[in-house]
């Protein structure tokens, strides 16, 4: 079938995003984690003491969706009061262990993903994608 949609960058991006997200979700599911959970764990590891609201802003996740996401990570994250209202988040020892396993999955997946891109386009891929969402 002819597909005139392939001439639209937005369509191509959506197809690529759907295909790669499904593949990564399957791999992370094998270790009992979701992409959003791994993203949160990675950001907390890089920013100990970060608040849930700051995580939500960074990831584009509404507050109503952050609450259950953080609930699923109980035991992997710890909360510590920052002031009267805010709590900072940090990884627990089990959280660091799970993140290490997740990072191995993500890094292997990302290496395979970039290997699919022709060598002459690899250096331009991330800057081009970033230009679309920054």
Task: Annotate each language-model stretch with its function.
Residues 13, 44-48:
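Short helix-to-turn junction characteristic of helix-turn-helix DNA-binding domains
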Residues 57:
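Alpha-helical residues within the helix-turn-helix
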Residues 21, 49, 71-130:
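Charged, amphipathic alpha-helical coiled-coil/dimerization segments
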């Amino acid at each position: 079938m002819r597909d005139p949609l392939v001439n639209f960058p937005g369509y191509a991006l959506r197809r690529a995003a759907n295909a790669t997200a499904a593949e990564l979700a399957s791999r992370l599911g094998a270790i009992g984690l979701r992409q959003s959970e791994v993203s949160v764990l990675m950001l907390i590891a890089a920013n100990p003491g970060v608040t849930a609201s700051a995580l939500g802003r960074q990831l584009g996740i509404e507050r109503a969706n952050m609450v259950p996401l953080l609930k699923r990570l109980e035991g992997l994250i710890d909360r510590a009061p920052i002031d009267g209202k805010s709590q900072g988040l940090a990884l627990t020892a089990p959280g660091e262990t799970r993140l290490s396993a997740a990072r191995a999955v993500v890094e292997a997946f990302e290496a395979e993903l970039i290997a699919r891109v022709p060598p002459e386009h690899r250096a331009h891929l991330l800057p081009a994608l970033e230009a679309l969402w920054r």
